[in-house]
């Protein structure tokens, strides 16, 4: 039989287009229709080629012919969802649950589909069952808390977030979910308090922290109203990442926005000795000294900058002033 040859060609990428892969997989399956691997690979090839209607038919057959494989139910449900048939997707997942019991990946799909179809109460029931099955998993409490939040049951949502934090008070996913909850309720003091915890975590990328701080400070009125909390956030970053250029600029910018020019100037001067030298810091020092009308200091730092960056025209212009 040529079936293995066609299968190997398709499986090893020996084709020019996804449609050609489908044809190779189809030939392998047609030559040996009893081989479930050929059948599944044919369905996968159709999905990769974006031929979802045909893939749906294949996975319907696979579910019937091989009902003991939960992955067939997962993919069939995903295809129904892609076809905007969430009810059929839920029926498929219910069938899987009856046959296999609760499988985390299928339960997650089911909850998401229940939320998408506005069946929040049913999604809550699913999440409660998950929590009861594994009460010491923080993420399970977070999921249930998120669903309570969607249902506007805030006290129950907070209780679940609290339980998650009791299990692991530093879990970033839990803290992010709690921050989103407070943001949705416009409880900004609570949001900033949780954000401070996030800023103290090494697990949250610095880039994300900087982006969040920028979002908070982009609104001048918000900046004024919550200045002390935002100052605390900026200070937290400055302490944790004292030598990161992005944080130096963030903290200096915060000091300047706060009217603390002398402190910003002192911060930049500390970093003039950094290696390799950063022309941005020299430029900032010269600009602030110029604004403060310290001509002797301007000349001093322009001279130092030119020694390090002789090709930079703007430093020559500064010396000219």
What are these regions (language model features)?
Residues 13-27, 49-61, 83-95, 117-129, ...:
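Structural signature of tandem alpha-helical TPR/SEL1-like repeats
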Residues 3-10, 200-220, 243-246, 250:
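Amphipathic alpha-helical repeat scaffolds of TPR domains
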Residues 1, 33, 67, 101, ...:
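Short coil turns that delineate tetratricopeptide repeat
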Residues 1, 26-30, 60-64, 94-98, ...:
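Conserved structural position within tetratricopeptide repeats
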Residues 98, 183-205, 214:
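TPR/TPR-like (Sel1-like) alpha-helical repeat modules
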